[in-house]
Amino acid sequence: MRTLWIVAVLLLGVEGSLVQFETLIMKIAGRSGLLWYSAYGCYCGWGGHGLPQDATDRCCFVHDCCYGKATDCNPKTVSYTYSEENGEIICGGDDPCGTQICECDKAAAICFRDNIPSYDNKYWLFPPKNCREEPEPC
């Protein structure tokens, strides 16, 4: 119960696509991004460095790269529009930035879903000192 309260408090200050990203992860992967991916490997969570440790961590690496390629916007605060058709997420709206970020978030959520079988608890709260390798390019 205490953990849920802490998560709720943390969400109070979060706006834009971070909340929407959490929603997409829940819809597509069926699990909470905060509870499963906010502190995993070298790339899931704030920042990112070194080499991705497994397929799940690679999802976050690719997501970071996708955000880095978004033009003229702040990926962590922009809101976006999407709809659901036959169980599929369709990114849309008039804001090109929002559409780019939606596509990044959607791809990451699909990647998380597809890699649930290889999720490894040893990478949860992975020490940053283990992420010192030279990173690969996006």
Curated annotation (Swiss-Prot):
GO terms for molecular function: calcium ion binding; calcium-dependent phospholipase A2 activity; phospholipid binding; toxin activity. PLA2 catalyzes the calcium-dependent hydrolysis of the 2-acyl groups in 3-sn-phosphoglycerides. Homodimer. Keywords: Calcium, Disulfide bond, Hydrolase, Lipid degradation, Lipid metabolism, Metal-binding, Secreted, Signal, Toxin. GO terms for cellular component: extracellular region. The active site is at residues 63, 105. Belongs to the phospholipase A2 family. Group II subfamily. D49 sub-subfamily. GO terms for biological process: arachidonate secretion; lipid catabolic process; negative regulation of T cell proliferation; phospholipid metabolic process. Its main location: secreted. This is Acidic phospholipase A2. It is found in: Secreted. It comes from Crotalus atrox. Disulfide bonds join 42-131, 44-60, 59-111, 65-138, 66-104, 73-97, 91-102. Residues 1-16 form the signal peptide. SMART domains: PA2c. Its EC number is 3.1.1.4. Ca(2+) binds at residues 43, 45, 47, 64. CDD domains: PLA2c (cd00125). Expressed by the venom gland.
